[in-house]
């Protein structure tokens, strides 16, 4: 039996001098021990998800904790059968979380070390979910929400996190005077966004400390009141959260049946994320629409070595046709 793989999720807002040089040093160490994952290092802190066997991940945690800036860094841990990443990336960026505030004329960025929402532990957050006078706001991307979310949470009409500040301003009158509690995967986005809400004038702003990942592991709440699965940005795509009464809420793009399997549309110019069973992925050549299924650069066709005749036959089976190739 192969050794279990540990997946570590973590972040910390802390000033890092010469962050670019530290990113290079960080990458060198990670590669030297065989760690895999994706890490962002910025002037404002560090944010990463990495995976490896017990010995490798322990070496990494010990090395990170040996730096006084990260001596109290909180690693959230999952055990898996396989690696969550294929390669190791450490990149320097201006911020570990980009709210788009400067781009969208929302004044300067937020420093969570100076202003952030009140921390709620899993038990307190569950109480907030059950409180009719509390607004629970999901701060993640739309495709993350569609795979799974807390029961009753508000789904902002946005495509990605950077659109959230404008959406909140547009809907301010709906919950400005109410208690607002926000949540995200591991907590890093909420640290910054809850601070922005405080600066915007919201009087009572809370955040799920440690994010959904921590809520699902809490021995008391055991992920209760979470519907679906949690989206993660690695090879796993999704992880279970609710250990009390788990449900599947996402539906197959093609037949509407319960499905938690995310794939990207095979048209490289679309690339939309859709839910699809393996059977329907093959049946519809992973195209989200007739146009994408017949697109000349359909990646499912090339990846699976389908001949043009085989491709045309699959489309014909679902009542669609493959355009003829023009010849000179």
From Swiss-Prot:
GO terms for biological process: tRNA modification. SMART domains: RHOD. Keywords: Oxidoreductase, tRNA processing. Residues 130-224 form the Rhodanese domain. It catalyses: uridine(34) in tRNA + AH2 + O2 = 5-hydroxyuridine(34) in tRNA + A + H2O. PROSITE patterns: RHODANESE_3. InterPro entries: Rhodanese-like_dom, Rhodanese-like_dom_sf, Rhodanese_C, TrhO, TRHO_N. Its EC number is 1.14.-.-. The active site is at 184 (cysteine persulfide intermediate). CDD domains: RHOD_YceA. SUPFAM superfamilies: Rhodanese/Cell cycle control phosphatase. It comes from the Bacteria. GO terms for molecular function: oxidoreductase activity, acting on paired donors, with incorporation or reduction of molecular oxygen. Catalyzes oxygen-dependent 5-hydroxyuridine (ho5U) modification at position 34 in tRNAs. Belongs to the TrhO family. This is tRNA uridine(34) hydroxylase. It comes from Streptococcus uberis (strain ATCC BAA-854 / 0140J). The gene is trhO.
